[in-house]
Amino acid sequence: MSLRLPQAISIQPRRSVGERLAVAIDRAQSFLRPRTPFTALNTVWRHIDREASSLLDVGCGRGEPMRFLAGKLRLSSTGIDIFAPYLRECQRGRLHGQYVLGDVRRLPFRRKSFDVVLCMEVLEHLSEEEGAQLIETLERLARRQVIFTTPVGDWDQHEFDDNVYQAHQRIWAPAEMKERGYRVWGQGLRNLGGLSGIQSPLPLLLRPLVDVLWVLAGPISHSRPELAGNMVCIKNLGREAT
């Protein structure tokens, strides 16, 4: 399905020089992280169902995870996001097979439409009630596997990129996801995540040092997500993924 958006919508959000540099750093990190053990995308890659033939990327954003996954998995993928400029970036990069401009709180898909439903860094942008509803909805849409990644601990973030949906509303705890039947792995170190992000209060040159600490903490927080700054949550609905 080809996505057609009004021409009046700007492809590139307005960013300050600092934000543009932070985005460039973030993209460099996006290349390195999936290839680094104990990071979120590396964990997703190790546990994703290899026999899946279809994937829904919920809140796909700029599509950075699919830059890595699409080159390794042979499946049809659909990306949905509410923010048109991000979706345009994905479309230009051909990161998914098709795109839907829509709200993750009202997903327009039928029950059991996809083998795998991937939802990376979305839960924290919703209220507690909306997040709980999203979890239940994605479990209805998936045939085989549901995958979430979301921050742990303090991770303050306000809107940026002219995108009001970027603000964090509610942070989930590993125990809450385990109670819902998810296997949970941690990454990084609690309360460090926001120090390396686009809205970090630290000078740009210091943020890579935070990333080094984040990676070094990986072997410990991976099996102890309550100590982590981010978590990967996976529920296999069919047989165990390989």
Could you tell me what each predicted segment is?
Residues 3-10, 19-39, 64, 82, ...:
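S-adenosyl-L-methionine-dependent methyltransferase catalytic module, highlighting the catalytic core
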Residues 42-155, 233:
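Conserved SAM-binding loop
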